[in-house]
Amino acid sequence: MSRLFGTDGVRGLANGLLTAELALQLAQAAAVVLGHDRNSNGSRPRAVVARDPRASGEFIAAAVEAGLSSSGIDVYDAGVLPTPAAAYLVADLEADFGVMISASHNPAPDNGIKFFARGGQKLPDDVEDAIEAQMHNEAVRPIGPDVGRIQRFSDAEDRYVVHLLSTLPHRLEGLTVVLDCAHGAASGCSPQVFKDAGADVIVIGADPDGLNINDGVGSTHLGPLKEAVLQYGADLGIAHDGDADRCLAVDHEGNEVDGDQIMAVLAVALKEAGKLNDDVLVATVMSNLGLKIALRDAGISIRETAVGDRYVLESMREGGFNLGGEQSGHVIFSDHATTGDGLLTGLQLAAQVALTGKSLKDLAAVMTKLPQVLINVKGVDRTKVKSSDVLAQAVKAAEAALGETGRVLLRPSGTEPVVRVMVEAADEETAQSIAEHLAQVVRTELALELISE
């Protein structure tokens, strides 16, 4: 039987995989695993529950809150809120755990449930496994005064906004910023915090109706943001995804500024301020080689991890580093947050534009992105990537040809018969040529063997 929890909680089609019954069972199990200890004063354990504005979030939240409260957990219902805001509130309220109902950048029919431990930390695999195992046991059913209560938490958004403002190194007066909120969870608080920080704000993608989240807007569809930045002559644009745990940007000329470039700008700024722990940035193996070259020139090292913000977080915790992230725009400031925070990232980026007086285009020029070609080779035996001598020799020859001006990365899929071939080079033509050659070697050498009857 496959594992219920994926890389970011439980996610699937609402009323398909993710039913009200499953949400109730998950909550009952989490109540036992995460809220089994009463607080020191004898009070019931407490949990924060928040969601993005998907229509299905209402019934899933109701099921989660029923499962928690019927298991003896007091619930703070924070309503519609970004994922990083939910994590922050778990820590700020000293709650025992938190639940976020969202499918992030997925389309509206999907939804998901993920949990935060005390302090707003993501759960390790073994705790998720314990929750899944507990689902097969009898639910805990307290009676009388031991049942949990549900409290509507009306100032959740305001608390989060005050926290974000407290992190700013410089106010944003004089800046015009376009915000694309993806018709998602940040539709209320992102415009509010940028206005409170002093910026002139133009807002798009901030009219959620439960069905339009991520629909042609947000960080996965930057076209509308680019158009708005040019139309209004804005200094920059900021795009969130549905639950606002990521941020991509657009400069005043409409050029995309991705997660790697954002991290380069912020890492250099933190180092110059003496606030970048050990002068290290944590990034994944998929970050552009141009990031490593730029930061090396700035005296900053990169600690590489596997793809996924959970691996970035693990490395940051282990090494005591305070900045990390992914090319996709998940950026983590561990001095201020326990997870990727698109609002925090956007504010910090805008603050650098205001503080330095430079355009975002000029700031992002600290890094030169190398052309990157990615080919997904399907229908191959992904388990043989490291055992094929012919493939190893082909990779070695490609790396020798690229020298220090490029790199090769082969990544087998974790679930499908697919191998991803990624090549970076000084020019697009070279990257494409080498990637296509290696993809052909993968097709030939890792071809799936046909089983004859």
Swiss-Prot record:
Binds 1 Mg(2+) ion per subunit. It comes from the Bacteria. Activated by phosphorylation. The modification Phosphoserine is found at S104. Keywords: Isomerase, Magnesium, Metal-binding, Phosphoprotein. It is an enzyme of class 5 (isomerase). Mg(2+) binds at S104, D241, D243, D245. GO terms for molecular function: magnesium ion binding; phosphoglucosamine mutase activity; phosphomannomutase activity. GO terms for biological process: carbohydrate metabolic process; peptidoglycan biosynthetic process; UDP-N-acetylglucosamine biosynthetic process. Its cofactor is Mg(2+). The keyword Transmembrane does not apply. The keyword Ligase does not apply. The active site is at S104. Its EC number is 5.4.2.10. It catalyses: alpha-D-glucosamine 1-phosphate = D-glucosamine 6-phosphate. GO terms for cellular component: cytosol. Belongs to the phosphohexose mutase family. Catalyzes the conversion of glucosamine-6-phosphate to glucosamine-1-phosphate. This is Phosphoglucosamine mutase. The gene is glmM.
